[in-house]
């Protein structure tokens, strides 16, 4: 069982093949305009993927405020 697990982990494709984008490689200073345009497009997609908003995650401050306000043990202002 352990041996088969190790073999399965070793045979997995690299992260880039699983959908996780790898940073595009700079084509060099002597690249053609077409190569630079392709690099710019790939870099833009890569940056957009890294900076996309993460929906469904709460910030800790907002969650803590909500929990404190709804607590029956919180002090009532007079």
Swiss-Prot record:
It is found in: Secreted. One of its GO terms (cellular component) is extracellular space. Keywords: Amidation, Cleavage on pair of basic residues, Hormone, Secreted, Signal. One of its GO terms (biological process) is neuropeptide signaling pathway. Residues 1-19 form the signal peptide. The modification Tyrosine amide is found at residue 55. The lineage of its organism: Eukaryota, Metazoa, Chordata, Craniata, Vertebrata. The keyword Signal applies. It comes from the Eukaryota. It comes from Ovis aries. Its main location: secreted. This is Pancreatic polypeptide prohormone. Disulfide bonds: none annotated. Belongs to the NPY family. GO terms for molecular function: neuropeptide hormone activity; neuropeptide Y receptor binding. The keyword Coiled coil does not apply.
